[in-house]
């Protein structure tokens, strides 16, 4: 398997390079197996079983989470009697999305309406590959490492909270996670100290009225028209209401609608409408008031229409805030394993990830892994044709093994 790394041409292959030469294609096959058999948040039974079995075959003990899906696995150095204290955790998320896989490939999803369009299959293959490497190279392991295979990242407020409540961070001194980044070419590692993602909330808006004939909308509540008004006016109103709170960001909030449904017939005004929205902000100060602002502005739009509004607002995940020292360690590891030119500073994104709950408990680094084929199209996350350059799997394993080695080597020089 050919990896895109600056270090691949060194005269003396490293142990991880030799291991990937032997096992890299197996990791790609594993990823394709996961890709073809995706499971939704909380339903990752087969995925959990597969990871558990692979760990067992390597002589490792894993513990399933109390929620039924997901697991953790500790590896400690040979001869260590200290137990798991001061360890490094590496996290992968297991779940897929409720959307169709539109690719024409052999490993296309075999589950209708479910696909790995966010790269969690890649994350799982990388973290599992790193665990399998250290299972056979314990003599190279400088300290205890916990491998976290987390369920339900896509379900607000996220399965990371289940890991935390299940003691998944006990004894952990720092945590590192990576995520596929289709805007970066394969072989590129994106890093950022401080906030690297945004807070992400969700809302379901219900609108109801008496219904009636479209010939006489003045005698009832025009729910379709009202829903359209909510969709067109609410984003601007919310943005204006929070504009004074934080002056450190060019934009403070995005309200984007993913679903709108009201009625089925052209000549019938419906009695019910439903709107689903995501609400995102890069600012913690804005996030603290966002639910109240959203509700107030929604009711302001609906007021006087005669409709009844029902709001189910879910406070989701905060921004992921990367620890400067841990991020520096990952950067040094990436430069050593892949070459300094492979490391790139990235901007804070509007995406959200429940990895944020981990970084509220222990110092951590959330890393963006380039997966774009330089000669192919850019395929965005959560899109039906999303796919990755599979050379990124070996690169991810190289990065994480180097991060483990660098983490236990001592304090980073900032």
Regions found by a protein language model. Name each.
Residues 12, 23-26, 30, 43-54, ...:
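General structural feature for long, well-ordered alpha-helical segments within catalytic domains
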Residues 72, 97-99, 103-115, 121-122, ...:
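Histidine/acidic-residue-rich, glycine-tolerant segments that coordinate divalent metal ions
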Residues 39, 93-95, 152-154, 181, ...:
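Active-site beta-loop-alpha junctions enriched in small/polar residues
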Residues 89-91, 100, 203-205, 366-372:
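Non-cysteine beta-strand/loop elements that form the S-adenosyl-L-methionine
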Residues 4-116, 121, 125-143:
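Acidic/His- and Gly-rich active-site-bordering loop/insert found
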Residues 1-7, 228-414:
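Metal-dependent amide/peptide-bond hydrolase catalytic core
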């Amino acid at each position: 398997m050919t990896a895109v790394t600056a270090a691949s041409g060194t005269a003396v292959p490293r142990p991880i390079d030799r291991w990937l030469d032997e096992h890299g294609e197996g990791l790609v096959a594993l990823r394709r197996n996961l890709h073809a058999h995706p499971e939704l948040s909380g339903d990752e039974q087969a995925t959990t079983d597969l990871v558990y079995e692979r760990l067992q075959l390597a002589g490792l003990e894993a513990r399933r989470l109390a929620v039924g899906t997901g697991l953790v696995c500790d590896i400690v150095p040979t001869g260590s009697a200290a137990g798991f204290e001061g360890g490094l955790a590496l996290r992968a998320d297991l779940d897929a999305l409720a959307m169709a896989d539109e690719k024409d490939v052999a490993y296309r999803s075999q589950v209708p309406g479910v696909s790995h369009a966010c790269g969690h299959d890649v994350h799982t293959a990388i973290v599992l590959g790193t665990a399998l490497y250290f299972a056979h190279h314990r003599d190279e392991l400088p300290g205890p490492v916990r491998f976290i295979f987390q369920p339900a990242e896509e379900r607000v407020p996220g399965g990371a909270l289940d890991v935390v409540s299940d003691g998944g961070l006990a004894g952990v001194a720092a945590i590192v996670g990576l995520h596929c980044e289709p805007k970066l070419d394969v072989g590129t590692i994106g890093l950022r100290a401080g906030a690297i993602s945004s807070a992400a909330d969700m809302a379901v808006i219900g609108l109801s009225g008496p219904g009636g004939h479209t010939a006489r909308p003045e005698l009832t509540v025009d729910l379709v028209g009202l829903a359209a008004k909510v969709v067109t006016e609410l984003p601007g109103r919310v943005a204006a209401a929070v504009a004074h709170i934080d002056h450190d960001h060019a934009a403070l909030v995005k309200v984007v609608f993913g679903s709108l449904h009201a009625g089925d017939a052209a000549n019938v005004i419906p009695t019910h409408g439903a709107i689903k929205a995501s609400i995102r902000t890069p600012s913690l100060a804005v996030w603290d008031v966002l639910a109240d602002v959203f509700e107030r502005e929604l009711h302001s739009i609906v007021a006087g229409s005669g409709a009844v509004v029902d709001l189910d607002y879910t406070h989701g995940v905060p921004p992921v805030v990367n620890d400067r020292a841990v991020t520096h360690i990952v950067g040094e590891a990436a430069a050593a394993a892949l070459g300094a030119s492979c490391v790139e500073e990235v901007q804070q994104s509007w995406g959200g990830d429940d990895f944020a709950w981990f970084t509220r408990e222990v110092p951590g680094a959330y890393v963006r892994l380039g997966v774009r084929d330089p000669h192919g199209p850019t395929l965005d996350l959560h899109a039906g044709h999303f796919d990755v350059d599979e050379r990124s799997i070996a690169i991810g394993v190289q990065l994480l093994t180097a991060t483990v080695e660098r983490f236990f080597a001592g304090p980073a020089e900032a």
